[in-house]
Amino acid sequence: MARKLEEYGYKTIVTYTTRPKRKGEKQDITYHFISEDDFKQKIDDGFFAEWKSYITNEGVWYYGSSLEDIENADDKSVIILTPQGYRDIKEKLPDKNIACIYLYENIDTMKKRLSKRGDDHKEVERRIKSDLEDFKNFESEADKIVYNNDGTDIEEVIKKILDFVEDK
């Protein structure tokens, strides 16, 4: 979704991860792919505005967002975060104007999309369980909820996002 918004002049803030690249992903475009040691050093250095680790079927994967990138973000910047990542950034940068749009997917849509990108069955199940816990009761914190289920027209989803952001 963030990449699609680039067609409308928005810039994606590229986040960091230690997980292996998937087919078609590119260094410094999809993510900044770094080693676990480098990631942990960046945590110690206070580099991240927010970060999270996941215990996956392939090991521990870390994800995080650069504090500097968030501080330098403008009104045309987009970042994908977990609810806790959003909370962490709001806490660290309370004066930053951040609009939170929750892209809701039902479980069937999540399963299809995760499987389509090549995740195995165990990883799909782990991810869904994790997301259900992470996003529980998050609707009340979001500024806008946009439903993005299977069969939803991508242009319709983009229009709802743009209409909301441009009115904010």
Where are these regions (language model features)?
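NTP-dependent small-molecule kinase module
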Residues: 112-119, 136-168
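Short beta-strand-centered segment that lines the nucleotide-binding/catalytic pocket of NTP-utilizing
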Residues: 8-22
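Post-Walker A alpha-helix
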Residues: 1-3
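Switch/connector loops and helix/strand junctions flanking conserved nucleotide-binding motifs
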Residues: 23, 87-89, 108-113, 154-157
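Hydrophobic/aromatic beta-strand patches that form the interior of the parallel beta-sheet core
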Residues: 13, 32, 99-101, 144-147
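Conserved phosphate-donor/acceptor-positioning beta-strand/loop module used by diverse small-molecule
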Residues: 78-83, 93-117
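Short glycine-/polar-rich loops that comprise or flank the Walker A/P-loop
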Residues: 10, 94-99, 140-142
